[in-house]
A protein has these predicted regions:
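Conserved pre-ATP/AMP-binding loop-to-beta segment of ANL
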Residues: 22, 37-40, 170-189, 196, ...
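Conserved AMP-binding/adenylate-forming core of the ANL superfamily
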Residues: 38-96, 113-118, 165, 178, ...
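ANL superfamily adenylate-forming
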Residues: 49-53, 135-181, 196, 289, ...
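Conserved AMP-binding/adenylation subdomain of ANL enzymes
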Residues: 208-225, 233-274, 284-289
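Gly/Ser/Thr-rich phosphate-binding loop
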Residues: 218, 272-277, 286-349, 362, ...
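Structural core segment of the AMP-binding/adenylate-forming
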Residues: 73, 103-165, 481-483
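AMP-binding/adenylate-forming catalytic core of the ANL superfamily
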Residues: 69, 112-122, 129-131, 275, ...
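Conserved AMP-binding A3 loop
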Residues: 53-58, 185-209
Length: 541
């Protein structure tokens, strides 16, 4: 049930209904193992959707502790190692092993190429690279060796599939170091929707408590089955889902590759109850289910964030899957969830807001110029002050200072509003805001309208440089099942709901959007590609 508050300005004080627990990832795994030693904790789902190996909580803890002892003989607490792999059980095991040994994991998208991977390894100061041989045609071992060449800090390149061989070198007399809940446990590189990635340093406490508050709001319990389709290199996969499962004691299916047809079959076969996915994944699941119906009646909860979740998509999910839907909002720098809808929220709240803040989380909407709190329903930058805020950007004090002000407020770079109930709405990114003839336009408002059109599957609205207006509004869209649609139809649809100045003047159809590793549309890439002539505007017939 939502918090009953009556605000007078766009500031939501931290709610104390959930206590912040001072535990590490390793301590949490030990606690859960005491409660559910023989309960299945982890199940492998391979690239074809076949069920592979499984671990009870007792086996997961034992395997993680054994590996942690071996790692403690190779690395010292605080050292950083890069993990470059798709979703595999070994990813989960090394996450807990590193946490137990006080080693900081640096996560890397398995789709990275040479320069991108080298940047992550070098900027983070990683002393080792853990990888797999290849993934989806990407020769990862070959690229990894090349990326580490000449980096003096890197001492080892280790195959994740050979983790069981490492413990052979463990000293039986060695003990694990003392790890504090405020210590760094992970460095996550920002997804790069607006440019160069920065490494957000996250603590045990921030990741664990955030995942627990998220799972609690979803009302997840030990009898749930959670399909982890989110990438483990992202806070959603290794944080929200993995740590949410471990704290509730439920079963996690770790899905190696997101294939919507495979995921639908997994829901039926394993009686999956809970799924977190970004909007593009949800669209794909709907399309797959329409083409090949299966029994998805076990599904209780969908949650989604990471990008705009269109109202029509939410309605379709609830209609087709007959389940509850929770929209949420956050970013890597906040471990990651800031706000989330409640399961009993109205369809209007779920469709048009991103919910109320999680427990122990202060949120305010602030003027960009003065940094003062705006009035209710006024547009400003969403700012957060909480346990979940990152420690800072790794080896980048300037960027850290730009992100977190002297009063501890983390500036998200997102624009939004807050109503008297503390429900937040997103209106766009500060950097995405379009200034047309001196008037501010918010892409999300336009995108939400377009996503109500039955033929639109995905959409991105960006500012295009213009000599007369400074910027004009460009709309880039993908249609359902690649069905053709004219610019005139979409223009008229917008005019039925928006003022003339908010209606796009440039319309481009795309087959596939440039995406980050966490499946967010890269608007700056779209804008650059348009200016380079990659997209041809549709005529206004």
């Amino acid at each position: 049930m939502s918090y009953e508050v009556q605000l007078t300005e766009s500031y939501f004080p931290a709610q104390s209904d959930g206590a912040i627990r001072k535990v590490t990832l390793g301590e949490q795994l030990r606690e859960t193992t005491k409660r559910y030693p023989e309960k299945i904790a982890l199940v492998e789902i391979d690239i074809d959707g076949l069920t592979g190996r499984s671990w009870t909580y007792r086996e997961l803890l034992s395997t993680s502790e054994t590996l942690a002892l071996a790692l403690a003989g190779r690395f010292t607490p605080g050292e950083r190692i890069t993990v470059w792999s798709p979703n595999t059980p070994e990813w989960v095991i090394i996450e807990f092993a590193c946490a137990l040994a006080g080693i900081v994991i640096v996560t890397a998208n398995p789709a990275l190429q040479f320069r991108e991977l080298r940047y992550v390894i070098e900027q983070s100061g990683s002393v080792a690279l853990f990888l797999v041989d290849e993934y989806r045609g990407n020769p990862m071992r070959e690229i990894g060796i090349e990326a580490c060449d000449g980096l003096g800090a890197v001492r080892e390149i280790i195959d994740l599939n050979d983790l069981e061989k490492i413990p052979n070198s463990a000293d039986p007399a060695r003990s694990l170091p003392t790890v504090d809940c405020n210590d760094p446990v992970m460095i996550q590189y920002t997804s790069g929707t607006t440019g160069f990635p920065k490494g957000a340093v996250l603590s045990h406490q921030s990741l664990l408590n955030n995942a627990r508050f998220y799972a609690d709001r979803l009302e997840v319990s030990a009898d749930h089955v959670w399909a982890n389709i989110m990438p483990m290199f992202h806070t959603s996969g290794c944080g929200m889902v993995t740590l949410g499962c471990v704290q509730t004691g439920c079963k996690m299916l770790i899905v190696k590759l997101f294939d919507p047809n495979v995921v639908c079959r997994i829901i039926e076969e394993h009686r999956v109850s809970t799924i977190l996915g970004v909007p593009t994944m949800l669209v794909a699941l709907l399309e797959a289910l329409q083409k090949e119906p299966v029994d998805v009646s076990s599904l209780k909860d969908f949650s989604s964030g990471g990008a705009m979740v269109a109202p029509e998509l939410i309605r379709n999910i609830q209609r087709v899957f007959s389940c509850r839907f929770s929209t949420l909002y956050g970013q890597t720098e906040t471990s990651p969830v800031i706000t989330q809808n409640f399961p009993d929220d109205s369809i209007d709240n779920v469709c048009h807001t991103i919910g109320q803040p999680l427990p122990q989380t202060e949120v305010s909407i602030r003027f960009l110029e003065s940094n003062k709190v705006v009035g209710l329903d006024g547009v400003g930058e969403i700012c957060v002050r909480a346990y979940c805020n990152m420690i800072g950007y790794h080896d980048n004090p300037e960027a850290t200072k730009d992100a977190i002000d002297d009063n501890g407020w983390l500036h998200t770079g997102d624009l939004g509003t807050m109503d008297a109930r503390g429900y937040v709405r997103i209106t766009g990114r500060v950097k995405d805001m379009i200034i047309r003839g001196g008037e501010n336009m918010f892409p999300t408002e336009i995108e939400n309208i377009l996503m109500e059109h039955p033929n639109i599957a995905e959409v991105a609205v960006v500012g295009i440089p213009d000599e007369t207006w400074g910027e004009v509004i460009g709309c880039f869209f993908r249609t359902e099942d690649s069905k053709p649609i004219s610019a005139r139809i979409l223009h008229d649809f917008c005019r039925d709901h928006l003022s003339p100045q908010k209606t796009p003047t440039i319309w481009c159809r795309v087959d596939e959007f440039p995406m980050t590793g966490s499946r967010k549309i890269q608007k700056f890439v779209i804008r650059d590609q348009f200016l380079d002539g990659v997209y041809d505007p549709l005529p206004m017939e």
